[in-house]
Amino acid sequence: MLYTISDLHLSLSTDKPMNIFKGWENHTQRIKSNWLRLVKDDDTVVLPGDFSWGLKLSETLEDFKFLEGLPGKKILLKGNHDLWWSTVKKVNEFFEQNNITSVSLILNNAIKVGDKTICGTRGWFYDESEDTKVRKREVMRLVRSLEQAQILGGEKVVFLHYPPVYGEYVCNDILAVLKQFNIDTVYHGHIHGSGYNSAVSEYDGIKFKLISADCIDFTPFFIV
């Protein structure tokens, strides 16, 4: 089975408690309890960003040990708060050094899971002129991921951290890529709390599902 949950905001190695935010009380234990109730060893869970508050890899170790201790394979994408994410090579070396064996990364690639192919990127949220470089980079990363998915075959399942549509904001560059590859559903995070009310569920024929942890009661969301 395939599940997803975004924005875990773990801080087991850092002093960044989430219980200062309404609704986030005891969130780590709630995630664990719900995960153990649903996810089996042969399942896969996609986590599209904001996994850990660690500022460097060494500050994420306890968070990754926590994740490693949960059943299933895990696929991570980068979020805006994942400042620990340096390069894929360095992160994979960190995993190897610390016996983190159930976690894979998506950045310019795609991963086949049964008859589904997981792809995506962080995305981008703003459209001001000074953000053009970053936005174009994220667009190309999404293109490369989707191209890799085509090579692997299977049904594409797309994850972004940032929603390409939110309130009155629309990232047309990202939407154009989704249209180009005939994507009809996107899973995303980033939005929290009352921001849920401005989340867009469908735009121009594409469905968007917000799966930030607090918006889905800290419970992995079942896809298929």
Regions of interest found by a model, annotated:
Residues I183-S198, C215:
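Short, flexible loop segments at boundaries between secondary-structure elements
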Residues L107-G114, N197-Y203, I223:
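Short acidic-hydrophobic surface loop/beta-edge motif
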Residues T14-V113, N172-N182, I206, L210-D214:
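Core catalytic region of metal-dependent phosphoesterases/phosphodiesterases
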Residues D7, G49-D50, G79-N80, H161, ...:
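Active-site glycine-centered loops adjacent to acidic/histidine catalytic or metal-binding residues
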Residues L8-D15, D82-D173, V177:
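Conserved catalytic scaffold of divalent metal-dependent phosphoesterases
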Residues M1-Y3:
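Extreme N-terminal starter segment of soluble prokaryotic enzymes
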Residues L77-G79, T121, F159, G189, ...:
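Generic beta-sheet signal
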Residues G54-L55, V165-E168, G195:
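Short, solvent-exposed loop/turn segments at secondary-structure junctions
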